[in-house]
C-alpha cells in the first residue's frame, strides 16, 4: 500500500519540477524557477526509488498511470483548466494499462 503513496508523491514532484521549467521557458518567468524545479525533480527521483519492485521498468510502467492521473489533477487545480471527457477517458485507459502491469500474473520472478 505504501507504494501508492510513493507513486503519488513522486508524480506531483515530477509535475511540479517540469512545471517550474515550463514557467521559465514557455511563460517567461524568472530563471530562478529552475532551482525549485531541480529540487522537485531530484525529490521525484528519490521518491520513485522507494517503491518496492523486483524490476525498475515494471515500477516505472505502473507509475505511468498514476502520473497521467496526477497530471489531470494538476491541470484542474493548479492551472485551473477543466479536463475534457477525452482527458478522463485517456486517464482511465492509462490506469487500466498500469493496473495490468501491476497486478498481472507473473510467470517467473
Curated annotation (Swiss-Prot):
Localization per record: Cell inner membrane
InterPro entries xref list: UPF0060 (IPR003844)
GO cellular component: plasma membrane
UniProt keyword list: Cell inner membrane, Cell membrane, Membrane, Transmembrane, Transmembrane helix
Main location: membrane
Membrane topology label: Multi-pass membrane protein
Keyword Cell membrane found: yes
Pfam families reported in the protein's UniProt record: UPF0060
HAMAP family assigned to the protein according to its UniProt record, in alphabetical order: UPF0060
Family statement drawn from the similarity comment of this UniProt entry: Belongs to the UPF0060 family.
PANTHER family (alphabetical): UPF0060 MEMBRANE PROTEIN YNFA
Annotated NCBIfam families: PRK02237.1 (NF002586)
Protein name as catalogued: UPF0060 membrane protein PSPA7_1846
High-level lineage: Bacteria, Pseudomonadati, Pseudomonadota, Gammaproteobacteria, Pseudomonadales
